[in-house]
């Protein structure tokens, strides 16, 4: 499937997801869609809690563990702090990678694609989408472009999702 066709299909699915009123169902659907879009083994969508200066995720594929990370810590925290997309072909070779999440979840991260999600004003990062372990290789430029397109679309929704705890 060509990138434009795949992007169109993903954006259409995002449109269907947008009518979901249940926050947990929306986040689960978003996590699944992101994972399918870039052929990742696992995906996590973090919400930025600016008051506590941390990232929060309760909905991550195949884990019931709530995840909280300080902004600036790990690759997801780095993306939230800098607003930069991070594509890492070997997670354990990158000094920014936080191995503690793998230890807590029992998951082994090989490679990562981490994309900041900007709020509707385009000035504040409101979330981070993190894709882990591209099937059959490392994440490529077209994966990054597609995940960035998803992030741009969901930003206005994520900025209105309350952070728990």
In which residue ranges do the predicted regions lie?
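Acidic/proline- and glycine-rich, intrinsically disordered low-complexity segments
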Residues: 64-86
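Signal-transmission linkers at sensory-effector interfaces
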Residues: 1-25, 36, 126, 157-165
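Amphipathic alpha-helical coiled-coil segments that mediate homodimerization
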Residues: 9-14, 22-41, 45, 75, ...
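A short, aliphatic-rich beta-strand micro-motif
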Residues: 110-120
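Short beta-strand-to-loop transition segments that serve as allosteric relay/switch motifs
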Residues: 128-137
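Signal-transducing coupling segments at domain and membrane junctions
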Residues: 54-56, 89-111, 133
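Allosteric cytosolic regulatory segments
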Residues: 144, 148-156
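GAF sensory/regulatory domain recognition
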Residues: 32-35, 42-67, 71
């Amino acid at each position: 499937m060509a990138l434009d066709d795949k992007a169109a299909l993903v954006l259409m699915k995002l449109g269907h997801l947008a009518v979901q009123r249940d926050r947990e169902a929306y986040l689960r659907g978003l996590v699944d869609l992101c994972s399918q879009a870039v052929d990742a083994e696992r995906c996590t969508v973090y919400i930025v809690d600016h008051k506590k200066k941390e990232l929060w995720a309760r909905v991550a594929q195949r884990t019931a563990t709530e995840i909280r990370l300080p902004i600036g810590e790990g690759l997801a925290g780095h993306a939230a702090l800098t607003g930069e997309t991070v594509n890492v072909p070997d997670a354990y070779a990158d000094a920014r990678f936080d191995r503690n999440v793998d230890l807590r979840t029992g998951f082994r991260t090989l490679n990562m694609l981490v994309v900041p999600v900007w709020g509707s004003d385009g000035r504040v990062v409101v979330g981070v989408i993190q894709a882990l372990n591209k099937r059959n290789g490392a994440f490529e430029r077209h994966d990054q472009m597609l995940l960035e397109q998803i992030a741009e679309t969901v930003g206005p929704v994520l900025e209105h999702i309350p952070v728990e705890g």
